[in-house]
């Protein structure tokens, strides 16, 4: 976890010991569940640290402080929880909604957020094109994030309905 600690510090926020433990637990759960559900091709703990956790945290400097302290984020096509879960670990005050079309992946995400002791996390199974019409999700988020979901043009079409006006 040293690489993760150094990287987070370089990005502008030190990790507390309980956050390091959450990342460690996340890595363990990811490797364990990946044996049953194809979540990621990356299973080496050092690579998980760098290619999943740190890569997800590179979004952190772009988040407005108001979002870091209690805004709402939607992670579209969350898959194994990237980038949403690392952002929630780094900024526990955010409200996080994880959206994925696979019920196998959303079962993993639900279990993971429980094991990590996370509050104010919602996991939804479905395609974002359909969920964007759900009244409780439409125009409800300060920030929408995604990783390796679609081209930028298509991703913008997916994300805009979830974003609060303004």
Model regions: which residues?
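Short capping/connector residues at structural and topological boundaries
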Residues: 44-47, 53, 90, 133-136, ...
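Class I SAM-dependent transferase core
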Residues: 1-70, 104-107, 111-122
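S-adenosylmethionine
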Residues: 71, 93-97, 101-166
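Conserved SAM-binding loop of SAM-dependent methyltransferases across substrates and taxa
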Residues: 80-93
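Residue-level signal for inorganic ion chemistry
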Residues: 30, 87, 159
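Conserved class I S-adenosyl-L-methionine
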Residues: 68-79
């Amino acid at each position: 976890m040293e690489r993760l600690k150094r990287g987070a510090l370089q990005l502008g926020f030190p990790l507390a010991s309980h956050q390091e433990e959450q990342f460690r637990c996340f890595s363990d759960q990811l490797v364990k569940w990946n044996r049953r559900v194809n979540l990621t091709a990356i299973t080496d703990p050092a690579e998980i640290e760098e290619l999943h956790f740190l890569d997800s945290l590179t979004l952190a400097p772009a988040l407005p402080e108001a979002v870091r302290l209690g805004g709402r984020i939607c992670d579209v096509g969350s898959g194994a929880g990237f980038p949403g879960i690392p952002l929630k670990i780094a900024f526990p005050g955010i409200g996080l909604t994880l959206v994925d079309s696979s019920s196998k992946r959303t079962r993993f995400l639900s279990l993971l957020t429980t094991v990590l002791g996370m509050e104010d996390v919602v996991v939804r199974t479905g395609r974002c094109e359909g969920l964007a019409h759900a009244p409780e999700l439409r125009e409800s988020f300060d920030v929408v994030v995604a990783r390796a979901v679609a081209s930028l043009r298509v991703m913008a079409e997916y994300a805009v309905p979830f974003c609060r006006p303004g």
